[in-house]
Amino acid sequence: MQLRYFIVIVASILFYSCGEGIAPEPVKQTGFSGTVTFIGNWPEGVTRTHIVVFKDPLLSSGDFNAFNLKFVSVEIPYGTTVFEYNSADTAVIKINEGEYSYVAVAQQKTPNVSLLRKDWYVVGVYYAEGDTTKPGKLIIPKNTLVKNINIKCDFDNPPPQPPL
């Protein structure tokens, strides 16, 4: 009789205490997410549109280079009005934790992909806390998905362009 109670108690403890105790830890994403909103008519002849992130500010045309470029999104389809993204899901070049000085949406009209500054036109810039006087810094801590990195692209009122 005591053995029967013992088995019931042990079975009950095991049954009720196994609530995912050995389940894997949830995957922690490192990156950023947000929404890109396009206002106005898309320019004719655009061949590609991407979200791009640069580590250092673009103070000269020389800063627009492959070593400074730290993230490139998948292509945003022509004519899109709203593009929601998560860098973990939409990366051509994945981003790591760190501090980044320039987050923008840029377009190109050349038939082939080019890394020359003259071939890209910035149509939207990330500004922190609504301060449109300078690009916002993106700070991504390790194992953190930074949310609400939203960019407005107004084709009738484009942002200042980085140096050519």
Language-model features: where?
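Membrane-proximal, proline-rich intrinsically disordered regions
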Residues: I22-K28
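C-terminal motif of bacterial Sec signal peptides marking the signal peptidase cleavage site
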Residues: L14-S17
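Structured interaction patches on ligand/partner-binding surfaces of diverse proteins
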Residues: K109-N157
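Tryptophan-paired
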Residues: L59-G98
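Sec-dependent signal peptide recognition
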Residues: Q2-I9
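A short, solvent-exposed beta-strand micro-motif common in secreted/extracellular proteins
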Residues: I93-S114
